[in-house]
UniProtKB/Swiss-Prot annotation:
Annotated source species: Shewanella halifaxensis (strain HAW-EB4)
Protein name (Swiss-Prot/TrEMBL): Sugar fermentation stimulation protein homolog
Family of the protein in this entry: Belongs to the SfsA family.
Pfam families given in the database record: SfsA, SfsA_N
Cited HAMAP family: SfsA
Recorded GO MF terms: DNA binding
Domain of life: Bacteria
Length: 234
């Protein structure tokens, strides 16, 4: 996806109250920007390193700037805005990048499903095959050369795995898609050291037929795209 305008840059000072981040602009001014990430952002917060942000012209917004990208001391780029993961996945499916998800007639977003009243991120439908329910997760935690999900305990993520297993039991296709938004991650696995319950459920889901795949994003201040598959350790 090409962004409507190139991101502007600054330097990270601090993230606090989950949704707020202080940065120093390139002109030296200190400002507060919106942080569109509800996770712990473990290993993504590097004070003094470069960050990039988008700017909204919506006058109703309290904070017009939104944090989009972070740079690590090693020079890796991290996509901070988890809300972009679904759009990246949709674009990649429509463009045939995700080979495992080709061949469907229609794509819908945020469709209600499951006994726990969830909304599936992406639903693929075709008259000649079972529906395909796709849950999208953004992976940004890099530790000791591996990418991990989640970066904090996630009861919501556990619920989504149960819903996907339920779809398989009903004869549908279910896929968990990790969108890797960290340029240093080349392999993904469950973070059992952070959320052992999620890791156990992920193994159960895989055993019951939920497909688990990962695709890596190439992100810059101008555009972001999913470009290649990434191995998942189960």
């Amino acid at each position: 996806m090409e962004f409507s305008s190139a991101f502007e840059s600054g330097v990270l000072l601090q993230r606090y109250k989950r949704f707020l981040t202080d940065i120093t602009l390139d002109n030296g001014e200190e400002v507060t920007i919106h942080c569109p990430n509800t996770g712990s952002m473990r290993n993504c917060l590097f004070v003094g390193e470069k960050v990039w942000f988008s700017v909204s012209d919506n006058p109703k917004r309290k904070y017009s700037r939104t944090w989009e990208l972070a740079q690590t001391p090693e020079g890796h780029i991290i996509g901070i805005n988890t809300g972009r993961a679904n759009a990246l996945a949709e674009e990649a499916i429509n463009n045939g990048i995700i080979t495992e998800l080709q061949g469907y007639g229609s794509l819908r977003r945020e469709v209600k499903y499951g006994s726990e009243n969830s909304r599936i991120d992406i639903l693929l439908e075709d008259a000649d095959k079972a529906n395909c329910y796709i849950e999208v997760k953004s992976c940004t935690l890099l530790e000791q050369g591996l990418g991990y999900f989640p970066d904090a305990v996630t009861t919501r993520g556990q619920k989504h795995l149960r819903e996907l297993m339920e779809m398989v039991e009903q004869g549908q296709r279910a896929v968990l898609l990790f969108v890797v938004q960290h340029s240093g991650i080349n392999c993904v696995q469950a973070a059992a050291h952070i959320d052992p319950s999620y890791a156990a459920l992920l193994s159960e889901a895989h055993a019951k037929g939920v497909e688990i795949i990962a695709y890596k994003a190439d992100s810059s201040p101008i555009e972001a795209r999913l470009v290649k598959s990434c191995p998942v350790r189960l």
